[in-house]
Each structure stands twice: as C-alpha cells, then as structure tokens.
Amino acid sequence: EMCIRDSVPRDGLPSGSSGGIIQVKNLEFDEIFSSSDTTGGYVDVTNFTMSITPTRNDSKILVSVDVAGGMNDNVGFNFRYRVQRTVGGTVTTIGIPPSGSYAMTGGYNLYNENNAVPYIFGMSRTFFDSPATTSSVNYKVQVSHSHAGSGAVVYVNRRGSSSNWRGISTMTLMEVCS
C-alpha cells in the first residue's frame, strides 16, 4: 500500500470532494502460463490476480492491465482476455462493451500463415471501476481463444514457438477519490 505525498490526506478527501490518489497496488506477473482449453472458454491465469480494499465506499478504482500474450504454431485465432472483479463472492466482468457475443477487455487477431513464427504481443487497457464497497475487491485476468477444438494454445508471457521469447504482464490498481 502506498500513499502519494501531497495528494490526499491518508483517510481520503471529505465526502463530495473529487480527485486524488489514496492508494496504489502493483503486480508484475512474470510467470509463464498456457491454456489448451478445447472449449474456447475463458480460463483464469494462475496467480495473475490482485486485491485492494477501498477506504471509501464512493472511491473509484483505476484498473490498468497489460497482458503479454502469445499463440502456438497451430493456427491463426483470436487471443482475448478479460478482467473480473470479485467482491464477497459476487463475480462481475468489467471493462467490456455493453453488448456483443465476444465482449472482451482486450485482444487481437493472430493469423499464423503457413506455420510462420508466432509472435508475442502486449495489450494494455485502463479503465475506472466503481465497486461501491469498503470490503476487499479482487481483480483477476482470464484468457481465451476463438477456435474451440482446434488445438490452439494461448500463452501469457511467452510466444508459442519458444520459451526464450518472454514478456512480462502487469496489473496496477489505484484507489481514486471520486
């Protein structure tokens, strides 16, 4: 937990005030993760999760996520990720559009023509969340691909053809007075 000097009193601003950072949490996720889920559904990225406990019920949480994602040598597919918030057992997907059958926080299309070398890409998203609680709020990253049953494998922090090509993924949570 960190308090930004000269930004906000440690207990936050008076109710109705706006602006100011109360606390910042950061996770540098450097583990290699892979999923060969055959359904194309979302899976949790093990250990790519972080919690913050807001000091105020009306605070917003600035969520910034950067995912280093890769693919295997098999086929082109859509790599996608999403962020989920859990408060007291209630899970909510956040940072997604209000509609769409493939709603996601971020993603990209990877087309691996003729088994060309698959790459690793960084995808960043930043958005405000309003959990409206002073209880612990957990944020986690999930990944998926678009080709169920295809043998597609998604990776976090490496590309598909070699574990020597590595990346690092990050999550930053900032409690901001609204």
Task: Show which residues each predicted segment covers.
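Short amphipathic
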Residues: I21-I32, T49
